UniProtKB/Swiss-Prot annotation:
Record keyword Membrane present: no
Highest taxon of the lineage: Bacteria
GO terms classed as biological process: ribosomal large subunit assembly; translation
Biological source species: Mycoplasma capricolum subsp. capricolum (strain California kid / ATCC 27343 / NCTC 10154)
The protein, known as: Large ribosomal subunit protein bL20
Length: 119
């Protein structure tokens, strides 16, 4: 039987990993072994980061809503409870956008939540 060599295949595979390591510092961009290890680690960090981004944005929206509601004499939790009682179904992202861009409309929503709390 003829001897089988995988030169082209191996080179292509290694080249693929080196290409993914573009922009890394030192041997992590040129050495196959180091590049492969770093790309695997980077992919793991990216996966975790995609999950954390959702948490970070939710907490940012909550901070913004809380900051906008405090001058009206409510805390974030009582405001959200008031919204629930008033049957207002607006997500936190939209509430935070309203608080920043349309403060008058946001104040109307706060007043409705206050009314629902007083009943």
């Amino acid at each position: 039987m003829a001897r089988v060599k995988y030169g082209k295949v191996t080179r292509a595979r290694r080249k693929r990993w080196i290409k993914l390591a573009k922009g890394y510092f030192g041997t992590k961009k040129s050495s196959y072994k180091k590049a492969h290890e770093q790309v695997i680690r980077s992919m793991a960090y990216a996966f975790i980061g995609r999950k954390e981004r959702k948490r970070d944005f939710r907490s940012l929206w909550i901070v913004r809503i809380n900051a906008a509601v405090r001058p009206e004499g409510l805390s974030y939790s009582t405001f959200m409870h008031g919204l629930k009682l008033a049957n207002i179904n607006i997500n936190r992202k939209m509430l935070s956008e309203l608080a920043i861009n349309n403060s008058e409309e946001f104040k109307q929503i706060v007043q409705q939540a206050k009314k629902a709390l007083n009943k």
